[in-house]
């Protein structure tokens, strides 16, 4: 899908000012990743042979994070599982960025999905675990065993409270998370070399925090030729989270880890802006012209369902979007990964994805499709009769679909009319034959009507940091 044009006004609340006491440096991420760490090493702990593939299980130490005076375990280790089809034809590989816990001591076994993708595409497919390495216990911290956002938010707090200085940048866990994925690609290439299979390039996919890390990995490593960030619908954090507050009038419980560490009190400060400048993918989007397939849920607990509006028209290159109707943050019970497989296969085989373009104007979505494409169209809509909130745990799985008959001119639109009370959300979904066992499934962005907010902008009760006027 080519560059999209949007006629609806976007909320522009981008903070550009940085601290006067420090010069901006957007290279912290790359500098950190490519600083050699003598702790890096790996070993192949198990090789299994099946009828149509081999499975390599590897333990990798990606490096160290912080010091023993700051955290109980400085060395990050990860399981890497690599599926190598007997009939490997491609020099590209798919790397899925996974989570997990260091308490799991056994090697990570390849999932049925991993094996299926490898055999379907005749390519190497791998997964890396423990992104981030967790749980961790920090010195002088009253809380034990921090995981996931709890771990990341604690590091954010330390960085912000220290004045967002260069010397404290290592507190940002996104740096070692990104380094781990880059080192994982190194290891996969080395394993490939040992079995005489050249791996030149990678497609990276990951969900939630791993979706954010998918973006940052592409920022620092040219081996990444396409990305699939999943359920990380927050690019351009500042206006996106102002939007979040104005829709809900509160912070969603899903981001309690950040609220509990006081991170939201830093919003609107030079220190907070500095943090985003270092680790937020939106800071680097002008460097990312590679194909991107963004997969989100319409009912995500973390992000408002029309958050695409704050970044989509700024993305460069070929970009594709899928809002999974009735999908929560885990896409539980709603998501079929077939479109991801089709996208990955198209990338590694240089197959063109049929062109379509969409845009939003006032209260309607417009979609134009290449007349040569073999496709079907659906509309999806949902109503909240009370407020502007489409999270699954608020409205349930209430999105309903309607088939749309194919038109003579391959042009479509969806009018999202204002309901009698509350708000209505809608989107268009297009399913396109990919020439494989799995079709492409893409959507437009979600449109909500009426275009109004039930709440005022967020103002911290106890603002922290140097405020931006």
Residue ranges of predicted features:
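Surface beta-strand/loop "capping" patches
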Residues: 342-381, 397-416
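Gly/Ser-rich "nucleophile elbow"/oxyanion-hole loop immediately N-terminal to the catalytic nucleophile
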Residues: 163-208, 224
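Hydrolase active-site cap/lid region
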Residues: 216-265, 322-325, 331-338
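Short beta-strand element of the alpha/beta-hydrolase
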Residues: 79-81, 90-100
